Amino acid sequence: MAPKKKVSALIKLQIQAGKANPAPPLGPALGSHGVNIMDFCKAYNAQTQDKMGQVIPVEITVYEDRSFTFVLKTPPAAALLKKAAGVEKGTENPLTHKVGSVTKAQVREIAEIKMEDLSARDIEAGMKIIEGTARSMGITVTD
């Protein structure tokens, strides 16, 4: 068995799918840890080519020998909710100003997409998490 590499950093970023480039914020975040930025950009863009237009969070593990691995996460719940509700952004005051609405079926669909990244045991618990996010954005959930 090969010896384990020592981890020197864990970097979490949210990047547009297929549009990673060395410009800020990506360049400085990776460059400060000695990672080859273009290698990461090419690998990330290749893996996210089919998800164009979405923001895909990525968790980059940088090792002491300056090599790296990365794990793609599911798109943020807020982004999925905005897309489902057809709104540009959430509200500043969710108590008084509602910006859109989604159905329970749409919430279930989003929860199924997000399930691997949520800390929920089952789909109903995942739906409650997504409904809470919708409420805080000023999006109402209808039956």
Curated annotation (Swiss-Prot):
One or more lysine residues are methylated. It comes from the Bacteria. GO terms for cellular component: cytosolic large ribosomal subunit. SUPFAM superfamilies: Ribosomal L11/L12e N-terminal domain, Ribosomal protein L11, C-terminal domain. Keywords: Methylation, Ribonucleoprotein, Ribosomal protein, RNA-binding, rRNA-binding. The keyword Lyase does not apply. GO terms for biological process: translation. GO terms for molecular function: large ribosomal subunit rRNA binding; structural constituent of ribosome. Part of the ribosomal stalk of the 50S ribosomal subunit. Interacts with L10 and the large rRNA to form the base of the stalk. L10 forms an elongated spine to which L12 dimers bind in a sequential fashion forming a multimeric L10(L12)X complex. Forms part of the ribosomal stalk which helps the ribosome interact with GTP-bound translation factors. Belongs to the universal ribosomal protein uL11 family. HAMAP family: Ribosomal_uL11. This is Large ribosomal subunit protein uL11. It comes from Bifidobacterium longum (strain NCC 2705). The lineage of its organism: Bacteria, Bacillati, Actinomycetota, Actinomycetes, Bifidobacteriales.
